[in-house]
Amino acid sequence: MEQIFSKLEFITSGEGFIDITNNLNLFIEKNNFDSGILNLTSLHTSCSLTINENADPNVLKDLREYMQSIVPYNSYLTLSKSREEISYKHYQEGADDMPAHI
């Protein structure tokens, strides 16, 4: 099977969701692919790739609220029965990077 490697870059302005479906479709169309496997990798630790439906905007609201509840900006709750709140120990890269690394 033929393989092609390419780099797609996306500029962001901080926390949020970016729909890259059209970018991927254009990449596939530009390269005249009929079939194959598309493997996506993020080279930045503060980024995640997810697959979600895009019909209901409340899905992204729910996902954002859920992520903020399990990995908040300033501290997190332990998974023990006591649910102790613990501050992050790594902070050198700024408040927005602390939860992003978890």
Q: Locations of the language-model features?
A:
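Active-site histidine-anchored catalytic micro-motif
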Residues: 1-102
